[in-house]
Amino acid sequence: MDNRTAIIKQPDNISSFHDVYKLQKEYQEALILDNSNPDFIWIGEHQLCYTLGRGSNYDNLLFSLNDAKYDVFKIDRGGEVTCHMPGQLVTYLVLDLKNFNKDLNWYLRKIEEIIIKILGAFNIDCHSRKGFTGVWIGNKKIASIGIGCKKWITINGFSINIDCELENFNKIVPCGIENCLMANMIDYNKNLNIQEVKRIVKKTIEEEFNFDFISK
């Protein structure tokens, strides 16, 4: 496969989910209009918020929306409710799957493989689970995946817990999985930091999708 150009954005600051989601949608629409436009990758952290997929069950929010102290967004992706916060690294991929494989199951499994390679770079043994989407360390979930797709142009992506406040997941039923335990990478490798993980995420995506990155 020939290399494809992708714009990559890696802010150092903690970013608003609303602003980054709007940016993704803009790149998605640009690719739909003209697939010669570059793909778009965003790697960073969010302020504390909760997001629900298109068909999410609000019963999986364990707090009232009427007096919520947190931002809650319903967005264009599959899957159930999840949480974003500082200390968790989020990666969004706005890709034209027509250049790769027009198969969403292939894409989900590809993302799982990418996450497993990222954690493997830090000597963390992890795995996918049959019947579920995401990546686990033993019986604890370390990474969540949620994607949207319109005319084969993807949106959203995956999150990896690096060193975040896992208590925030207690306010939801994560990914709709009852009694789901969550994990942080830092608990399995004390020497890592989020900037180093970010570097490996970029490198792995670049290699797996044959991208030539343009920083922006």
From Swiss-Prot:
Annotated transmembrane regions: none
CDD domains in UniProt: LipB (cd16444)
UniProt-listed Enzyme Commission number(s): 2.3.1.181
Binding site for substrate: 77-84, 144-146, 157-159
GO CC annotation, single: cytoplasm
Pathway annotation: Protein modification; protein lipoylation via endogenous pathway; protein N(6)-(lipoyl)lysine from octanoyl-[acyl-carrier-protein]: step 1/2
GO biological process entries: protein modification process
Sites marked Lowers pKa of active site Cys: 141
Superkingdom field: Bacteria
KW Acyltransferase (keyword) present: yes
Catalytic activity from the UniProt record: octanoyl-[ACP] + L-lysyl-[protein] = N(6)-octanoyl-L-lysyl-[protein] + holo-[ACP] + H(+)
Subcellular location(s) per record: Cytoplasm
Keywords, ordered alphabetically: Acyltransferase, Cytoplasm, Transferase
Residue span(s) of domain BPL/LPL catalytic: 35-213
Active site annotation, chain numbering: 175 (acyl-thioester intermediate)
Gene Ontology molecular function: lipoyl(octanoyl) transferase activity
Chief localisation class: cytoplasm
Task of the protein: Catalyzes the transfer of endogenously produced octanoic acid from octanoyl-acyl-carrier-protein onto the lipoyl domains of lipoate-dependent enzymes. Lipoyl-ACP can also act as a substrate although octanoyl-ACP is likely to be the physiological substrate.
Family that this chain belongs to: Belongs to the LipB family.
Miscellaneous comment text of the record: In the reaction, the free carboxyl group of octanoic acid is attached via an amide linkage to the epsilon-amino group of a specific lysine residue of lipoyl domains of lipoate-dependent enzymes.
NCBIfam families: lipB (TIGR00214)
Name listed for the protein in its UniProt record: Octanoyltransferase
The species this protein was found in: Prochlorococcus marinus (strain MIT 9301)
